[in-house]
């Protein structure tokens, strides 16, 4: 019995030694898909993954400031300059892309966004247009300028650092407040007082793509390399797709 107990203890110790903690810094728009993929990876590998979510500008600032993570998942606007600095490795797998959607509070009449002309009228008629200061919001502000709407609506534009704050604002609003946010973030609020109206019209839609890149710290970790490789598998892609990440 004593020998059997010692063998069990030795096996347990070996498994604990083999397991590793992996740290990931990621954009928040892919949170639903990433959490599902990470859960599957943890179950299969025995490794523990700790994920921190930030906006794209915050990710760049943190990595450039010396914060240490094994894997960074972000849009090209962040990945490219960090690669040039040598802060992350090139050639990481794409985890998918996220489109821009429109939302109102539950119970509010859904605005017409079927066409770009309809979207234009909806924006002009809104009491407030609410969007973030991250990748999604940067694109949307640029779109309003291209549609010659920015001057007319700038005064009723409300900006937040992240998508959650955008949706909380609209959820708690009373007028014709409209949120423009990543579709994945909107879907997280579908049972929390937010109604998903739909994606932007195809001719003005924008997809933000996300790439998983190893840092120098992560490149030296077999477990981190294993997770990066997992993101390229069909299983991972299916989990991201099911969560709205194309």
Set out the residue ranges of the language-model regions.
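Bacterial N-terminal signal peptides
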Residues: 4-15
